[in-house]
Structure formats: structure tokens, C-alpha cells
């Protein structure tokens, strides 16, 4: 197979041999990639690579290796015939363009000519007759080592940060850092760089410094890997929802209301008319006739879309005008939200969230990018969790049957250990961060934990009421909702059954001071009389005409990726982070 790969473009591109062998290069490279370790053998343990869950219709597709071997053998025979006719081995006459990740995984038995790689110079070490260049292109954490004779054309332009194309031989390396290296015969400087002023040097640079140059930060190996892992996560989620017959949607970014009712919104106005933000008498002059905001959640609009096509989802930016200057908060971040129609049980919503995250992790865990990131070597600063701890997180996320307990049971459990907390657990006051960490650590055993059925008065108005009459086991009314807690990071997701009945919804909105005016229980036009929900009138309308039971959830996408990568500050997970006082680039 190695011989076949080396000769992948010897014949004409129109031939079937070329088509077979061109596709073989990526297959061979993938098959030589080592499988990442995971404490337990996924094929033998409690995690199955073939079946995501008992309720999931998706099955991982496998290549028919016998058919693949037949095609390879056929191609090799045709190549041998061509060589016999020519009387000598065929040589490649066209360049072989490869990514650096492909090169580093490629270990041919003999040297390969006319290999081309492109990327950015990470470092240059000058010797008397040669320059040793480290090249990166974002496809791999590890750089490619290239040996460049000093008399090579344009070799003097090889400086840190330069964009270059190198052509040469791929040969076995006498050094220990990598099995092969490139002996360069041609250098093309595509984008010059001044090494003295380039802000990113080979030495370790702190996350705090890199945040001051967000436009250049992605060029560092770790940040490039984070970008690729983010892309792979989006691809895995998209496949999961497509396989489960969810419709991807694009809800609006501009909205007329604050979904959470917390008032933490950004108001939007044209730059030419900033005065309209404060002038209450200028309603007629406003661009949208009244104040509009950047969305804090797409949930309400997703509920409307779900009543059309059933199950829907989105991955959209949301905005919070919070002045929280912490490692967990941003003013702009991405939220994955999903809504399910015709469901009447919170367990169904939790099942979807659990299956989705587990599926995403299992899919990503097979990738070269994740394998390399979790098994990287070198300096581990305080900005990254050690790889062995991050591996344990992945194992927990890919495990089956995440624990579930009610909020009331959680409070009772915490009260048994009350002396360990700064804030004593009280049923009416919610869970503090220290409580969530304790639950995730001691109840989950490394797995995520669902906490359900929170007190009604500390949750949002749109959540369906559950137990409304207090008894010996439950001090007050609750709502059918959940928070998903993970060790170390705490909450990464929240969801609920939505209140689909008109009168209970209006009652809840009244308790939250959203409905203006009184209303009676008599129905007029399928709506209680006198009820005015203001900017949320349209949301109330959804309950007036054929609103089925439904539920959904939201996941802080950036926070989830922080957990899976070991990045300890969400500002380092987002390419261009915005938080209070900072909105660079």
C-alpha cells in the first residue's frame, strides 16, 4: 500500500488507476494514524464506537476493507504493467502538494521527490551551510522540519512569520525529533515578514499577552488547534442533528425583548442617531419605531419555528451586557439551542442533550486534531489543564447513563456536608458555584450530572410548572427543568419543558412582572381578557392556536469547548473575545 501511495499520480488523471490511487493517499495516511489511548478499550468497554445510544438511529459507517484491498491490488498491477512496458520505474512528474499533518504521518520507505508544502515559518536556525526551518500551517501542532541550503534562491527571506512555499525531497531524518524531514530545493516567499518586529516569537508567551493581539493569536499552534477542534465540533453536531431529523434554523440576532427577563441586553440604534437610545419622545424617529436589542437567547423564536417543522436547532451568537469580569463570562458567545415538538416528558429532552454531547465527543475523539491535542508534549502552563485530566473529562463525557437527581435531593445531599461550604445550601436560594462543583464531583464520579426540578420562583417564566403543592419532600412549587453540571466547570447546559398552556403562561408572566394589567379566566378570542404582554405578545400568540407540548435546551458552546480542551479562560477559547471594557479588532 505504501508503494501504491507513492505512485498516486504517475498515470494520467483521466484513468481509473489515477482515481483509485488519488483517493488512497488519504486512506493510507489515516490507517497509519495511531489510535489515541483512553483508559478503557472503547470497543470492549461500556462505550461503543458503533452505536451512539440505544435510542440513536445513527450508525458509524465503515469502509469495506476487502473491496479497498482489491482496488489497491488492481491499481498496483496496472502500474507494474506500465513499468514493464516502459522498461524502468515510473517517476512522478507533477508536484505532490501535502499539508504538514499529512507529511508528518507519511513515512515512505525511500525518498520522495517534488514534494510541496506551504505554511508559516515558526523558527529559523542558521548554520554555516544550511538553515533549519520549522514550518506550520495549522494542520498540526508539531511543525515540519526543513533543511534549506543557504545558497537556495530566496532562502534569505526565511524569517519568523513569513508565508512560504517549500519544494524538495521528503527523506528519512537523522535527527530524533521526527522520522522524516524535507530537504528543500526551492523556496518561494509568498508573504515576507520582519522577524524583529513580528509579535509572536518561538518562546512561551502568556495568554494575557496574546489577548492583546487577537488578530495574530490564531497563528500560534495551540490556538490553531483550538480553531480546528471548534470546526470539528460544529461538523459533528450538524451530522448528529441531521441524523435525528432536526431542522437547522437561523433565528434573528435583533429582537424586541429580553428572553431571560434580566435586563442584561445591548440596545441597538444607528450610529447616526445615538440620541434615540435615551430620548423617550423620539419614538417616531427610531429606526425600528421602538427600542430593539441584541438577542440574549434564540429560544423564543425557536419555539415559533418548532411549531412549523417540528424539531429545530441553531448555533448562533448571543449577547449579554453583564459586567462580570470572570474566566467564565463573555459579552458575545455562541449558544447551541434545540427545541423539540410533541414531547411531554423532561427525560426526553435530557436524553437528547446527553446523546448529542456524547455523540459529538465520540466523533471528535477519533480525529487527528483531538488525538494530537490530548497527547501533546511540551510546556503545560497554568492556562491549560494537564492532558491527563482533560483525557479523564473526555472519558466521562463519552460514558453511558449520566446521573440525574432532583434539586430537592441535591439540597438534602449538600446539607449533609454543609460545613464544607462558604454559602450554606438553602432550598429557596439556588445552587452556588461551590455547590455545583461538589455535586459534579461526588455524584457524577467523573460523568456529567443532571439536576432537575428547580424551585419555580428562581427560574424563568416560560418553564412549565411541575409540582405546585408543597409537601414533606418538596418545600415549594417547582418547574420541569434541568441544569447539566460537569466536574470543575459547573453548569454547561440548561433546559426545560416549556409552558404551552395559555393561562398558566400568563400567570407566570404576571409573577415575573412581564404582563401588564389584569386578566380574567373567561376566554375571548382564545385569550384571557385584559392581558398585555407588550413585546412578548407574539410569544403569547403561539399558545392561542395549536401549541403542542414542547421542550428544549441551550448549551454554552464556547464553555463546552473550554471543558473539552482544558482551556481555563473562555477568553482564550474564542478567537476575538468581547468582555466588559474590551472589544478589540
Model-predicted regions and their roles:
Residues 2-585:
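Class II aminoacyl-tRNA synthetase catalytic cores and aaRS-like
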Amino acid at each position: 500500500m505504501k508503494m501504491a501511495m507513492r505512485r498516486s499520480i504517475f498515470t494520467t488523471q483521466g484513468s481509473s488507476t489515477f482515481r483509485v490511487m488519488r483517493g488512497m493517499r488519504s486512506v493510507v495516511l489515516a490507517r497509519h494514524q495511531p489510535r489515541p489511548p483512553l483508559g478503557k478499550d472503547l470497543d470492549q468497554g461500556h462505550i461503543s464506537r458503533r452505536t451512539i445510544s440505544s435510542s440513536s438511529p445513527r450508525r458509524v459507517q465503515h469502509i469495506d476493507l476487502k473491496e479497498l484491498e482489491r482496488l489497491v491490488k488492481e491499481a498496483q498491477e496496472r502500474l507494474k504493467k506500465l513499468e514493464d512496458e516502459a522498461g524502468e520505474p515510473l517517476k512522478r512528474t507533477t508536484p505532490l502538494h501535502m499539508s504538514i499533518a499529512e507529511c508528518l504521518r507519511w513515512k515512505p520507505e525511500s525518498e520522495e521527490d517534488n514534494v510541496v508544502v506551504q505554511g508559516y515559518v515558526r523558527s529559523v536556525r542558521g548554520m554555516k551551510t544550511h538553515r533549519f526551518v520549522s514550518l506550520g500551517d495549522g494542520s498540526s501542532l508539531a511543525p515540519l522540519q526543513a533543511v534549506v541550503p543557504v545558497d537556495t534562491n530566496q532562502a534569505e527571506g526565511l524569517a519568523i512569520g513569513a508565508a512560504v512555499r517549500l519544494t524538495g525531497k521528503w527523506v528519512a531524518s537523522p535527527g530524533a525529533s521526527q522520522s522524516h524531514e524535507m530537504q528543500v530545493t526551492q523556496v518561494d516567499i509568498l508573504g515576507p515578514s520582519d522577524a524583529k518586529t513580528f509579535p509572536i516569537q518561538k518562546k512561551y508567551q502568556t495568554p494575557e499577552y496574546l489577548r492583546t493581539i487577537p488578530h495574530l493569536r490564531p497563528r500560534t499552534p495551540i490556538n490553531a488547534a483550538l480553531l480546528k477542534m471548534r470546526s470539528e465540533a460544529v461538523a459533528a453536531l450538524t451530522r448528529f442533528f441531521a441524523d435525528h431529523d432536526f431542522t437547522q434554523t437561523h433565528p434573528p440576532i435583533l429582537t424586541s425583548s429580553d428572553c431571560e427577563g434580566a435586563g442584561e441586553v445591548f440596545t441597538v440604534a444607528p450610529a447616526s442617531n445615538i440620541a434615540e437610545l435615551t430620548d423617550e419622545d423620539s419614538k417616531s424617529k427610531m429606526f425600528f419605531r421602538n427600542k430593539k436589542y441584541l438577542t440574549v437567547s434564540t429560544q423564543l423564536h425557536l419555539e415559533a419555528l418548532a411549531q412549523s417543522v417540528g424539531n429545530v436547532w441553531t448555533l448562533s451568537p448571543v449577547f449579554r451586557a453583564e459586567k462580570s469580569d470572570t474566566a467564565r463570562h463573555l459579552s458575545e458567545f455562541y449558544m447551541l439551542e434545540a427545541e423539540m415538538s410533541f414531547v411531554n416528558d423532561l427525560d426526553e429532552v435530557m436524553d437528547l442533550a446527553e446523546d448529542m454531547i456524547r455523540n459529538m465527543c465520540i466523533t471528535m475523539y477519533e480525529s487527528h486534531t483531538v488525538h494530537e491535542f490530548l497527547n501533546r508534549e511540551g510546556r503545560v502552563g497554568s492556562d491549560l489543564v494537564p492532558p491527563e485530566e482533560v483525557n479523564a473529562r473526555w472519558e466521562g463525557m463519552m460514558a453511558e447513563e449520566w446521573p440525574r437527581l432532583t434539586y430537592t435531593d441535591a439540597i438534602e445531599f449538600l446539607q449533609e456536608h454543609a460545613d464544607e461550604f462558604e454559602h450554606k445550601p438553602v432550598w429557596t436560594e439556588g445552587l452556588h458555584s461551590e455547590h455545583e462543583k461538589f455535586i459534579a464531583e461526588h455524584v457524577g464520579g467523573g460523568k456529567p450530572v443532571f439536576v432537575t426540578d428547580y424551585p419555580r420562583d428562581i427560574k424563568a417564566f416560560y418553564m412549565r410548572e411541575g409540582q405546585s403543592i408543597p409537601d414533606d419532600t418538596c418545600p415549594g412549587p417547582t418547574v420541569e427543568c434541568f441544569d447539566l453540571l460537569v466536574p470543575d466547570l459547573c453548569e454547561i447546559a440548561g433546559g426545560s419543558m416549556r409552558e404551552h398552556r395559555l393561562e398558566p403562561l400568563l400567570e407566570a408572566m404576571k409573577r415575573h412582572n412581564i404582563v401588564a394589567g389584569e386578566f380574567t379566566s373567561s376566554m375571548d378570542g382564545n385569550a384571557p381578557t385584559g392581558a398585555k404582554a407588550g413585546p412578548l405578545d407574539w410569544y403569547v400568540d403561539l399558545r392561542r392556536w395549536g401549541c403542542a407540548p414542547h421542550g428544549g435546551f441551550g448549551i454554552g458552546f464556547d464553555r463546552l469547548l473550554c471543558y473539552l480542551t482544558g482551556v481555563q479562560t473562555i477568553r482564550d477559547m474564542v478567537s476575538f473575545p468581547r468582555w466588559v471594557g474590551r472589544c478589540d479588532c
